[in-house]
Amino acid sequence: MIDKAYLLELCQQFELPLQESMADQLDKYAELLVEWNEKINLTAITEPKDIVVKHFVDSLLLTKAIELPEGASLIDVGTGAGFPSVPVAVLRSDIKLTLLDSLNKRLVFLEELCKAIGVKSATVHARAEDGGKDKKHREKYDFACARAVASLRNLSEYCLPFVKVGGAFIALKGPDWKEELAEAKNAIGTMGGKVEKVEEFTLPDESKRAILIIRKVSQTPPQFPRTAAKMTKKPIV
């Protein structure tokens, strides 16, 4: 399906320690992604070369932006087709992975995928705002990550409630991250977060990426997260 040599070469360039067996796992991932995408809408990116760059390398760069301790717990909020966390779990099989999505059919795909490529994961069928208020998940994870299209302001409200104090929210963003961050500053603080650093990358197709590390420094107040409608109606400014 994908050009594994190209994937391995790119990983070498970015100093990502991907092994050949892991490239085989990602090849199977690409195959299943394209196959399932015909039944359910998972991604607009289906060309093999684009999958390598825009899905796999883009996701794996998360491990360059932050050191994930061995056995750390990671929840991917609104995971969709499994990006960025499933490629991260291929590279780091010690990570305790949880995949949260509001659409059950996406979770069915992810369960099949993880079984097929040998990635251990748990799935949670919930909206982010419900999961973040659930005692089973609230402030229970070392890390939360998201590569979603929602604004950073809203993503912070969705994701920081899942993170333990001392942990971090990892947001994967595009070239407009500075504007998003300026708009999100107060929301991040309100949720108990503090921006620790931003790592910028240029992908092989010249597209710009930023990975924002937001440290959880205090507990999220109990009234958060709110519903998407409330976030829109009363944004934290």
Label the predicted regions.
Residues L60-A150, S156:
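Conserved SAM/SAH cofactor-binding pocket of Class I
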Residues I2-G71, I75, K105-S121:
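Class I SAM-dependent transferase core
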Residues T46, H125-R127, E199:
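Short loop/edge segments at beta-strand edges and connector loops
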Residues G166-D176:
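Conserved beta-strand signature within the Rossmann-like core of class I S-adenosyl-L-methionine
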Residues E129, G174-K178, T202:
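Short "lid" loop at the C-terminus of a central beta-strand within the Rossmann-like core
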Residues R106-V108, W177, L181:
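Short alpha-helix immediately C-terminal to the canonical SAM-binding loop
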Residues R92, V163-V165:
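Helix-to-beta-strand junctions that scaffold the AdoMet/dcAdoMet cofactor pocket
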Residues A182-V237:
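SAM/dcSAM-binding transferase cores
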